[in-house]
Amino acid sequence: MSISIAAIILAAGRGERAGSPHKIPKQYRLLGKKPIIYHTVCRFLRHPAITTIILVIHPEDRQICEQALAEFKERFIIVEGGSTRQISTLHGLQALKKFNPQYVHIHDGARPFIENELLDNIHNTLTPQEGVLPVLPISDTLKRVNHQYVLETIPRTHLYSAQTPQCFPFEPILAAHKQAKRVCKEDFTDDCAIAEWFGLPMRTIPGDPHNIKITWHKDFDTAHLYLQKKMQMFPDIRVGNGYDVHSFEEGDFLILCGIRIPFHKKLNGHSDADVALHALTDALLATRGAGDIGTHFPPSDPQWKNVSSEIFLRHALSLLKQAGGRIANVDITVIAENPKIGPYRHAMIENLMTILAITPDRISIKATTNERLGFIGRGEGIAALATASVLYPGEIPQ
């Protein structure tokens, strides 16, 4: 039987220790090309066991938060936090009450590298009577210091550093937070401490050394290096395909890849009927999951009558650039009995080089016949297939 597991992501802090030069809270500073909170939220969104996500933010951060997470706006709930972490957590728990989850993760918004493996290990350890805490053994020698002098060395045996997410049965941790508020107990540094105080047992599991919390300015350097390494290991390369077909009508030229080709017929279409650029536009849109050319430029709209298909291609390209995409290569196959494409291939490649800003070795344009089969074989029209490979920032999700 499946269980319902929610997540509360705490992002209401000001992050003064991280030292932002632009006074931007650290969770909204860029890591790679996306804010830290974007990376954190993504980790929970992509895990199939997480049913509900509550994002607790500072009241002044709603606009910047909504901008940072615009593409996910339907997939999480924003709750305003309080003056302390403990109060913010209670706000998140109270907002979750109507969803009645069985368990809840409570996670620091400034820990962007939580992996599915750790979440799975937590879920496999859950019971209705216990919470789960990921921990790491302390490797440094610990000293108790007073006024810059060492008082004693503290044995490391049985000492661990705590990470988040910390996961709890929902009702007990909500009750613990409510009880702490009632008795004005406000000095807890994490939710595990509240659970301990309330009498809820906490079982530990091995944490992940890469699951760092970005607290100090130097932590950004560590995070950037780790992200770069991850991107090199699992680059987010996406492949899109496009297909288009247009019939012939009377005319004296047609346009392919933006190049005018003399012919005794032209292609019938609402725009200039550049079947090759239409297929390529669809291929590029596919890498963003952005629909097809008809979604953006409906043929029922008279403003696109007889316009150059380069407009459509440049629009798709702008969507790629907004997401930080870079074209790795494009491949177009024109399927036609006539006209012959060979004499115009070089001009087509040069035109695409200009539009796409890529080198010719990343552009393939070729043609084939349909061996006189079907409507293409009968010379009734032209079809085109296109494939595009685009590299986006970030890594491939697990």
Swiss-Prot record:
Which CDD domains does the record cross-reference, listed alphabetically?
A: CDP-ME_synthetase, MECDP_synthase
> What are the boundaries of the signal sequence?
none
Residues where a divalent metal cation binds = D244, H246, H278
Site annotated as Transition state stabilizer: where? R17, K26, H270, T369
Required cofactor(s): a divalent metal cation
Outline the segment boundaries, as ranges, of region: 2-C-methyl-D-erythritol 4-phosphate cytidylyltransferase: 1-237
Please verify whether the record's keywords include Iron. Answer: no
Protein keywords: Isoprene biosynthesis, Lyase, Metal-binding, Multifunctional enzyme, Nucleotidyltransferase, Transferase
Q: Does the keyword Cell membrane apply?
A: no
- Which reactions are catalysed by this chain? 2-C-methyl-D-erythritol 4-phosphate + CTP + H(+) = 4-CDP-2-C-methyl-D-erythritol + diphosphate; 4-CDP-2-C-methyl-D-erythritol 2-phosphate = 2-C-methyl-D-erythritol 2,4-cyclic diphosphate + CMP
Record-annotated site: Positions MEP for the nucleophilic attack: R156, K213
Q: Per the UniProt entry, what is one GO biological process?
A: terpenoid biosynthetic process
Instruction: List ligand-binding residues for 4-CDP-2-C-methyl-D-erythritol 2-phosphate.
Output: D244, V245, H246, H270, S271, D292, I293, G294, T368, T369, N370, E371, F375, R378
**EC identifiers of the protein:** 2.7.7.60, 4.6.1.12
Q: Where is this region: 2-C-methyl-D-erythritol 2,4-cyclodiphosphate synthase?
A: 238-398
Q: Which InterPro entries match?
A: IspD, IspD/F, IspD/TarI, MECDP_synthase, MECDP_synthase_CS, MECDP_synthase_sf, Nucleotide-diphossugar_trans
What are the protein's GO molecular function terms? 2-C-methyl-D-erythritol 2,4-cyclodiphosphate synthase activity; 2-C-methyl-D-erythritol 4-phosphate cytidylyltransferase activity; metal ion binding
Task: Tell me where on the tree of life, at the top rank, the source sits.
Answer: Bacteria
Pathway it works in: Isoprenoid biosynthesis; isopentenyl diphosphate biosynthesis via DXP pathway; isopentenyl diphosphate from 1-deoxy-D-xylulose 5-phosphate: step 2/6; Isoprenoid biosynthesis; isopentenyl diphosphate biosynthesis via DXP pathway; isopentenyl diphosphate from 1-deoxy-D-xylulose 5-phosphate: step 4/6
Similarity comment text for this entry: In the N-terminal section; belongs to the IspD/TarI cytidylyltransferase family. IspD subfamily. In the C-terminal section; belongs to the IspF family.
Main role?
Bifunctional enzyme that catalyzes the formation of 4-diphosphocytidyl-2-C-methyl-D-erythritol from CTP and 2-C-methyl-D-erythritol 4-phosphate (MEP) (IspD), and catalyzes the conversion of 4-diphosphocytidyl-2-C-methyl-D-erythritol 2-phosphate (CDP-ME2P) to 2-C-methyl-D-erythritol 2,4-cyclodiphosphate (ME-CPP) with a corresponding release of cytidine 5-monophosphate (CMP) (IspF).
Q: Which NCBIfam families match?
A: ispD, ispF, PRK09382.1
Name of the protein: Bifunctional enzyme IspD/IspF
